[in-house]
Amino acid sequence: MIQKEMEIYNLFTFQIDLDKKLLFEKSNDQKNYSKIRTHYFKHKFKNKSAVFLNKNLIKNSLNKVLLNFSDFVSGAGIDTVFNQIIDEDPEVLNYLKQVKKDLSKENNATSQLTFNVTINPKNTLANFFEGFNIYLHFNEENNTVIGSFSLQWHIKKTDLFSETKNIAINNLIHTFCKNNMHEISFMQIINCFSKTKINKHGEIVLKSCAFKQKWQNVVAEKYPFSTASKDLEKINDFFDALFVMLLLVCHLNKNLLWLCEKTDFFEWKPSQKTALFKANDSGAYLARMLLFLNDWYNENQAITTADIENVNEVEDIGKLVEKYSTNQPQKLSLNSTVYVLQTKQKQFFLKNDFFFNNNEAKLFFLITMKPNVFGLDDTAIANNLNLKKISDFFKEIDFNDEDILNDFKQEQEKLLVRRTFNQLLFMNKNTEILSVVNDKQKSVIHNIVWTITYSKAIMLKAFDYSKAFEKNRTSDPSLLRSNLTVINRLRYLSEYFQNASLKYDLLYTKAKQYMQIDKFINDMIRKVNHEDEIFGKFKERIYLSLGIISAVVFGIVEFFNCVWTILTVSQEVVDKSVLDPRNIIFISIGTILVLFLLVTILVFMTRRLYLFEINKKHKN
């Protein structure tokens, strides 16, 4: 055995742009302290546990921003889901435990907060997840909030084949999600379960869910185990548990977004209809979670009775959410996986690669960093490989072959990001990370998560700004200059995050390279400049056209004035003067010239408008 212990973390990053510094102004307002204390000591009697509040803790940090971060902490039955925090230090919430600064980040940045939520060991979710961490970075200078939710798997110490199974399931389920969901968001999850029926008792019938049936078909094909029914049931339960956790973090993300936009921290009602989270399997738990969110929206939004009566499917819940949702995007990045492997025997990574002299270590590296070798990447669902064939493939790899060994070493050096006395750190193009360590230190994991969070948040911002640019390009080009300003600001924000990454700045740089962030930003800047230049020229043409029209009108008036002065007309002989051949010639020539000028202008303007419409349709 090469490993003493292995951990798997799934990271989902988010970012929130603030229109004003309302959030940061509220966090410094000490008038709210009495409201906070009163509000949460009321909940103490519902939860039958004391809630300790420390004025200095609230004053010196942004902890009170989190006081209503998750209103379901006071809901009925929540104590069956999460472990309550019992600590000698004051805690703001019963279930959110703040990670100390010296653990969460080596530079003790005051703008960063890390919270840990532990799953109750008696809950069915504990079979799959130990809990999750919430990483929050408040950047007042750039008016932004970014962060990640890090789900930690519950893994028992097993052999390589069992570890391979866990890694394969992780790859497969996230590949499945990526192929069926273009983003991780509350609405996307609701849409996946959209045709799931709700019976007359208000219970969600997951057996009617086509999305879950699709997953079960994939699993049955890819994992033909000898104890098929037992293993398939466990993998299906993991699928349900993962979506319960995703719904939880999407709900938390939604609440944080509202905190950033609301003018009052304490205007929400705690959920009274929260379904008891007591279920003996994750499928029933998932159904309860969907119903809980339905209750939450019904109580916290101005939903009519007619709206509630029309809820017959999960899709109808989604319609309510969409109808009463905020305008700002509420999405999480697609999953990044961090594998942390603690070695069985201490290694000296800086001077040798003895660790990879073991074939088991080589295979572990390949299946985590090069899953495509075994068909565990995006092609896993399309091809005919299954876990049994992969295990047979393991045995066929001959690392004594010089070519195979050289290829392995090249891949190892290519993906190596950091080498120290106690750690080897690798990252592949999918931003999946393998950290091989002698001693499992939480600070190492936190620093890795922070670095990936920074890089993915920049990409999320770039995508959001790109969508805003495309919208303004067609609807209001006058806003392109403001788009250019915020996009240029991304460069400085990227440098700021790189400096915040400290010793892991190489990991941050590598992640940016894999995601092609700099290229995306530069291409977007060129595109915005090009469109702004076109819009500028279009405005110049409009002004020029107006100038020409004004000149033409003025010229025509002057022309007739001139003609009138040279005509041989007198007041006494007006009738005879009109019939004078010389006057008729002057008037005819002038009329022809004016008509020719007007026709030329009309043809020119019509042609320009026609070409403008053609270009507009082509761009769309």
Curated annotation (Swiss-Prot):
Domain of life where this protein originates: Bacteria
Membrane-topology descriptor: Multi-pass membrane protein
Keyword Membrane attached: yes
Chief location: membrane
One GO cellular component term noted in the UniProt record for this chain: plasma membrane
Record field: transmembrane: 66-86, 238-258, 546-566, 584-604
Keywords (A to Z) from UniProt: Cell membrane, Membrane, Transmembrane, Transmembrane helix
Presence of keyword Transmembrane helix: yes
Coiled-coil residues: none
Cellular localization per UniProt: Cell membrane
NCBIfam families noted in UniProt: MPN337, MPN338
Protein name: Uncharacterized protein MG241
